[in-house]
């Protein structure tokens, strides 16, 4: 006959604790199995560009297998089903949108197979005629390092809402003074990232030739037709002084030799006042090239020194509605485009706020730039 010793209080406590932990583990396992059935999309709207074959993508996150259905027409979609985790879905435009406004093509309904959870994505297409087209024109090569920084700033600002249904063109001379290239900065909705695409090359281009500038400005309308236009000119500037005058005037002669008073002092910081000697264009010639276009610009912005003066503004009085310019020097870095771009394309690119553009410039040089040198003005040309 076996004799069982009575359990000590310590053994009983250990056994009860073990049983409690086991029960909690089982309960936690049951709770994990009862994970809420969920499905979600990375965005509520997939916006296709205006051309047939353009694509946009979004990510589906689900707790289990799912399928999708579509309503509407004018687009294809793949894949039409997925599993637990993340799945990239691509929408492709079957046709172009030749109109002047964004159109809704249809809706994608995503349904979880178990549990019935749902979400939806609207499929839209931008118009062939943009709400507005901005040209960032940066002639010359003396400021090329800063031009590339400016382009990087533009691309950092570009997203699904900037420029929205607007367009951004960039023309500059990365290779030689006799050449130029026209690019577009846009949001690649398929890769969900900013992109920079070459639209046209100019093998015989002279920034000082009004005819070349006039042809380039005409290409803006051909490449990116829009309801409204704006032009930014980033370069060196010397106010109303004629292009063929290196110095301020003949009355400013310091000796028998004409001293070029635009030459920077040794060790001076780079500004947008000096450089690219002999490659200038007169304001009157530039104004004539702008006026010769089939479109009128809503604004001209001079990312250059000394352009906010009554003489220059008078020459531009028939070219545009607003002029943003500096009455003094602008540092080589120029405008903070990453901060300013969203104000050029407010409300999905339908509108702009030029006052906020000026504030972005002032706040940058006042609070964040290494040099506190920033003065900017907004001129209303009708006044």
Sequence positions of predicted segments:
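Surface-exposed loop and adjacent secondary-structure segments within mature catalytic domains
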Residues: 173-198, 228, 232-277
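A short beta-strand micro-motif common to beta-rich folds, especially ectodomain repeats
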Residues: 89, 101-116
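Sec-dependent bacterial lipoprotein signal peptides
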Residues: 1-28
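Bacterial Sec-dependent N-terminal signal peptides
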Residues: 2-3, 24-47, 115-128
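Surface-exposed binding patches on compact interaction domains or structured appendages
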Residues: 38-41, 62-90
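Terminal, contiguous helix-loop blocks that mediate binding/assembly
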Residues: 246-249, 255-383
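Solvent-exposed loop/turn segments at secondary-structure junctions
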Residues: 140-143, 174-178, 204-205, 235-241, ...
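N-terminal extension/subdomain marker
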Residues: 127-227
